[in-house]
């Protein structure tokens, strides 16, 4: 059976989402053991979070993971699997998983306007500019290489939620 978290409407950022997962049994595994972003990080998640080589989507009850010690990237963490199951996403948004597609549609129709503030913002604690002389995205972001045969490191989120036009069934 799926883990159901308390109804959430106060999750407005990744930090809060991770904290909610930390407080929900079985939803987050965190490690300080060094992991190499080249094939090792995704391999560890494959067995701990996804439950081995499985049909997609990822195992519904598998935890998200936070790696706090990334080889070559001191003081950097990587979160993986936060949105790995529809049930987890639904729990974080406080809706039933069958309502996610409709929620996405509603959000696209009524986007939230940005808020401008003169106060310190947590998302601006560290700022890197492409115009900085030492700017190098590959040194800043520990983008994983998922397999030894990948063309290189990449950041991606493949997500699709569709409803069959004739049957009304959603995937």
What are these regions (language model features)?
Residues 3-171:
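Extended, highly charged
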């Amino acid at each position: 059976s799926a883990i159901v978290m308390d109804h959430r409407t106060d999750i407005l950022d990744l930090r809060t989402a991770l904290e909610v997962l930390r407080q929900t049994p079985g939803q987050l595994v965190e490690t300080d053991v060094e992991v190499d972003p080249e094939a090792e990080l995704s391999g560890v998640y494959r067995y701990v979070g996804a439950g081995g080589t499985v049909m997609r989507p990822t195992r519904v009850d598998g935890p998200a993971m936070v790696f706090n010690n990334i080889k070559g990237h001191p003081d950097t963490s990587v979160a993986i699997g936060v949105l790995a199951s529809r049930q987890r996403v639904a729990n974080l948004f406080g809706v039933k998983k069958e309502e996610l597609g409709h929620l996405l549609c509603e959000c696209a129709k009524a986007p939230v306007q940005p808020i401008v503030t003169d106060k310190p913002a947590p998302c601006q604690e560290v700022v890197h500019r492409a115009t900085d002389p030492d700017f190098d995205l590959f040194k800043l972001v520990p983008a994983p290489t998922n397999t030894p045969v990948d063309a290189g490191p990449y950041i991606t989120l493949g997500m699709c939620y569709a409803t069959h036009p004739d049957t009304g069934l959603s995937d």
